A protein has these predicted regions:
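Residues forming the flavin
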Residues: 1-293
Length: 293
């Protein structure tokens, strides 16, 4: 884009387009951890999310790339990252793995040490899921080169001390004991959830959803970007949590699939419609959620 390509004064408007195919790539929303009371987000000054520390680390961010404590603006000496906040937790309705938290936590932990080599960093994890190309080597580098400490166990509670430092109580499942360590800054590695408004769009497109709220594909292996609605395709986190390489690959696949009916010019659709039997219908509307037609 050239200079002044973005019109900041533009107002919201509704337009109507006639299209042949649709690719739903609506992204995601980061999980809001304020509902997990024991972690104190929104109550404790020095408890932040991964998105907030990403903003700090960015050279064009408000701190010029330096990680600081929100309480006093000073650089923290001890930093803790808590993985799986808003993921793999059935108590809050998020039983799925977000697939990105482990790796972006290690990335941010390394950057903290790059900016301030004396920083002590600890990662609390349930399981390290370094599944992608080069990810296991990245995990090994975090341990051996950067000296990041990994504690296997999900923290039970965070306490704020009088000096605004934070004490994490957690069970180290490898040692089989409860630990309490104090940190200057705690970062909650939040998971991914379906974007706001995605359910309304899903109903408009006539697409089914999985139990976790993401759009359901026609077949997880054979048609991973197709839906049961002809002409509608899905890509990225709209279909389920995934990282950038997988999102890019799926976006390319969805574009290729969408190009097929466009190149043909016309498509024959199956004349299948759904009808309800008013004599036995209880008006529960469960069929609306389940029926692909």
């Amino acid at each position: 884009c050239g200079p002044d390509a973005i019109d900041h004064n533009q107002e919201a408007s509704e337009i109507e387009l006639e299209v042949g195919t649709i690719v739903a790539a609506i992204g995601y929303d980061p999980f809001d951890p304020s509902g997990i009371y024991q972690y104190g987000y929104g109550r404790y000054t020095n408890v932040i999310t991964a998105m907030e520390i990403e903003r700090m680390i960015n050279a064009s961010g408000p701190t010029g790339g330096h990680v600081i404590k929100p309480s006093d603006g000073l650089e923290p000496k001890r930093v803790a990252f808590i993985h799986c906040v808003g993921s793999r937790d059935e108590t809050i309705g998020k039983p799925y793995c977000s697939r990105v938290c482990c790796m972006y936590s290690m990335k941010n932990a390394q950057l903290c040490i790059d900016h301030e080599p004396d920083t002590e960093v600890t990662c609390y994890y349930m399981d390290i899921r370094a599944f992608g190309k080069g990810y296991e080597e990245f995990y090994k580098t975090s341990q051996e080169k950067y000296g990041i400490e990994f504690i296997r166990g999900k923290p039970a509670q965070i306490f704020e001390n009088d000096d605004l430092t934070l004490t994490i109580r957690a069970e180290d499942t490898l040692l089989g004991k409860v630990t309490e360590y104090t940190y200057d800054l705690v970062v909650l590695s939040v998971g991914l959830e379906h974007a706001e408004g995605s359910d309304e769009l899903r109903q408009t497109l006539g697409v089914s959803k999985s139990a976790d709220g993401f759009y359901m594909e026609a077949h997880p292996k054979l048609r991973p970007v197709d839906t049961l609605t002809d002409g509608v395709y899905i890509a990225g986190v709209a279909q389920g949590p995934k990282d950038i390489p997988d999102s890019v690959a799926q976006g390319s696949a969805a574009a290729s699939r969408a190009a097929i009916p466009m190149a043909q010019g016309q498509v024959e659709i199956e004349p299948i419609i759904a009808a309800n039997d008013e004599a036995i219908c209880g008006a529960c509307e469960v069929c609306v959620e389940l029926c692909p037609y």
